[in-house]
Every structure is written in C-alpha cells, then in structure tokens.
C-alpha cells in the first residue's frame, strides 16, 4: 500500500506533500516522506525532503503517529525555504534565449538527459499549467520539473535537488 497527499495553501502553487508506504505482511519497512517534492514509485521506493523509515514489527502501529508528526514538524522549515525560493524565482525575468542557454547548461551538468530537452522546451513555450505562462525563472524551473517526471525512480529526487540548487546558484550569481 502506498500513496501521496498534497496539502495546498491559499497563497502558493506549492503544497506540502506527505508520502507513505506500508505492507500488510511486514515485507517492507513503514515509510513516511514529507516535503515540497515527494515521490512514491509503484515499486515502493520512497523519497522526499525528509524520509523516515521504521522496521515493520508488531508494535509499529503505536509509533506511526509520532513518526508522521516528527517528519511534518522537521520538514516545515525546508518547505518554507522552497516557498521562499519560488517567490524569488518569480521575480527574475527570463527571455527565451536565456532559457535556452540554461537548458544547455543543465544538460551539460547532467541534470537532464537528451530525451528531456524537447519536454523542457515544449513546457517553456507552451506550459501545461497556466500559472507558469510568465517568462521568469520559476516558469523555467517548472518546465524542467515537468521533464524530470520521466527520470528513473532511483534518480528523480537527486535530479530535483540538483535543478533547485543550480537555479538558486544562478539567482545568487
């Protein structure tokens, strides 16, 4: 059994997500992941800004509430930082040429692969979501994250962290 729930807030396109996995037969550990980017693959791999795993024993149910609350409290500051970073990126205009240069740069850094380039370009030129039509760094970020959805499960979180770090380094430069 697995799933992800995202809590939306009124002032942001971002939402705090909680992912979970469990098994009835104790064949895998109970897992909870929390953050702005949470992924639970159908092979039950679990990643997030914060991930907590607990061996599935007969007493695991007494610990689940505490594990979940602890994960949520610890992830709030990371989530608030992502929200703050998003607001900063929204204030940085980006032309098509700047987006194409950055696209080449992140490809060169190995954040995206060749199959993702057309996806990023399409999402940049014709965003799937109206909220990303503005020509700014935030829209570019979301074009890239749309392409990252096709990443192999074992590298999706690493790639999300890499694009976030790379674009925030761009902001600081």
Which ranges hold each PLM region?
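Intrinsically disordered, low-complexity regions enriched in serine/threonine
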Residues: 6-173
